[in-house]
Amino acid sequence: MEEFDSEDFSTSEEDEDYVPSGGEYSEDDVNELVKEDEVDGEEQTQKTQGKKRKAQSIPARKRRQGGLSLEEEEEEDANSESEGSSSEEEDDAAEQEKGIGSEDARKKKEDELWASFLNDVGPKSKVPPSTQVKKGEETEETSSSKLLVKAEELEKPKETEKVKITKVFDFAGEEVRVTKEVDATSKEAKSFFKQNEKEKPQANVPSALPSLPAGSGLKRSSGMSSLLGKIGAKKQKMSTLEKSKLDWESFKEEEGIGEELAIHNRGKEGYIERKAFLDRVDHRQFEIERDLRLSKMKP
């Protein structure tokens, strides 16, 4: 007996429940298993009071070869999850549609308010009173009349006439006549007209001399002396430089090359441009030499 008591029955493998193979199930075994499952389900429902009961939606587990299977439960869970996700998507879409509709309504309200504001304010600012319109028309008329007067004044100088002036010069005992076209309002034309007016009464003096009486010998002698002095008066002399310039101007007018020469002189190869360049070079050289002298003079 002592030997029998000393044996460890808790670790023995012989007391384990016998599990038959898949092909050895009997009807009694199946019924007992179903009853055990029902008892276990009732105990679990009593322990989990106040929670959601999922046992009603879950069917009785079936026995198959190799153990229990829960395929139906997994399918139902997947269906319930898909239904929940679809319902959530529908809710989100409905909320988005509501948000879009609310934004459109808000924009319409803002547009209506802005249009009403413009209707209230716009016409008053745009429509000026009749007095202001009249004043504006009067100012426009006065300004337009002033502009016309100014335009006429500007056009008047353009219509000035040109006058030909003939001057007589003495060059080496020869009489040289120079004819130029000058504006009638120029100083040269005015001086020429004044000289002609002075010469006219003096030219009429010889015709009045024979009518003088015999006792006026003094006056006759003075008149004759003045006339002889004017006749023998020396003409304005012309220098060689002025004569050559006059000949060159007349040659350009005859040949018609005045414009061509002016364009050529304005170019880089013209005499005037080259002379200006050389003058600039000389001036620059002078400045450099001056700076050197000043730098040497400083202590």
Swiss-Prot record:
The keyword Isomerase appears for this protein: no
Cross-link Glycyl lysine isopeptide (Lys-Gly) (interchain with G-Cter in SUMO2), residue numbers? K150
| Stretches for region Disordered | 1-156, 192-224
Which GO CC terms are listed, alphabetically? kinetochore; Swr1 complex
Per the record, residues carrying Phosphoserine are S82, S85, S86, S116, S216, S250
Composition bias, Basic residues? 49-65
From what superkingdom does this record's organism come? Answer: Eukaryota
Record note on modification: Phosphorylated by CK2 (casein kinase II) in vitro.
Report the function annotation for this chain.
Answer: May play a role during embryogenesis.
Q: What name does the UniProt record give this protein?
A: Craniofacial development protein 1
Which species? Answer: Homo sapiens
